[in-house]
Regions:
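Alpha-helical transmembrane segments of MFS and MFS-like solute carriers/permeases
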Residues: 4-8, 73-77, 81, 118-119, ...
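Juxtamembrane helix-loop-helix connectors linking adjacent transmembrane helices
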Residues: 22-37, 58-129, 136-141, 256-264
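Short, Lys/Arg-rich N-terminal segment immediately upstream of the first membrane anchor
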Residues: 1, 64-65, 237-241
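Transmembrane helix-loop-helix hairpins at the membrane interface
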Residues: 113-263
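Membrane-interfacial loop-to-transmembrane alpha-helix junctions, especially the N-terminal start
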Residues: 1-4, 185-186
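Hydrophobic core of alpha-helical transmembrane segments in multi-pass integral membrane proteins
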Residues: 6-14, 45-52, 78-90, 216-232, ...
Length: 264
């Protein structure tokens, strides 16, 4: 079910974006409409499809009841990831020549509220519900925890359709997936993702040279290795059915095809 829903979202991603542009008059010229369009797109692409994948359960997820320390760690990891990737992304853009999209900034208090909802809160909630709650947990029982983590991470990054942001999407997706697998609750990746997005908004004018990429990278790598060690025991790789394998290949190749215009 998770793969079928993901395939449907991959096929509808571009038509939904086009439809929203036709529905809302010139969202690029008005910050309020721009944020409303982003919220609507997030809800249609990720929020509603995530409901089709309920309940978000897997036999391989061990639910941890402690929440305060875990939430604090999620805040730290999400914020540090954004800071590290702010230093890495310009190097990646220079290497690949990828174009970076501009985010429209708010001009008043009401627009700031809409901006926080559109850029921080809503994406964290609906994307984590879809990718970690639905896709990751759905794949865990069919192919094992570690392969499910790696594939859901790749699909998350590809489905965002941004070559410039590809390394950053890979990094936060991997860490959110590890958080879900090690703690068993959607709250952990949601908090991590929300802090990652929030740091991007708050630090948007901070020079990349100010970001200590190397020490932050060491910290994040150590955290990722520690979480990986916890999930390795959850089961070996289980071979997918032929139909599921074909569907997964179509999803990955179809999502990757969105990058062709930037690469040629």
């Amino acid at each position: 079910m998770a793969l079928m829903v993901t395939l449907g979202v991959m096929l509808l991603r571009l038509p939904v974006g086009w439809g929203i542009q036709q529905l809302l008059p010139n969202p690029q010229g008005d910050p309020a409409l721009y944020y409303a369009a982003l919220i609507l797109q997030e809800m249609l692409l990720w929020g509603l499809p995530a409901l089709l994948m309920l309940p978000f359960r897997s036999r391989r997820l061990v639910v941890q009841r402690k929440w305060l320390g875990v939430s604090t760690a999620a805040v730290f990891i999400g914020t540090m990831t954004q800071m590290a990737m702010m230093a890495v992304t310009p190097l990646w853009v220079e290497l690949t020549g990828a174009g970076q999209g501009e985010i429209m900034l708010p001009r008043n208090e009401i627009q700031w509220v809409l901006a926080v909802l559109a850029l921080v809160v809503v994406p964290a909630l609906v994307e984590e519900a879809f990718f970690r709650g639905g896709l990751l947990t759905g794949l865990c029982d069919t192919m094992g925890a570690l392969p499910a983590l790696l594939l859901s991470t790749l699909v998350f990054a590809l489905m965002h359709g941004s070559l410039a942001g590809f390394p950053a999407h890979l990094a936060i997706s991997l860490l959110c997936g590890l958080g879900m697998l090690t703690r068993g609750r959607l709250r952990v990746p949601v908090v991590m993702h929300m802090c990652y997005n929030g740091a991007a908004l708050l630090l948007r004018n901070t020079p990349a040279s100010w970001m200590p990429a190397l020490p932050l990278g060491v910290i994040l790598t150590a955290a990722a290795m520690w979480m990986c060690a916890q999930i390795l025991w959850r089961g070996r790789y289980r071979q997918l059915k032929a139909a599921d394998t074909a569907m997964l290949c179509v999803i990955v190749l179809g999502a990757a095809a969105m990058y062709i215009p930037e690469l040629i």
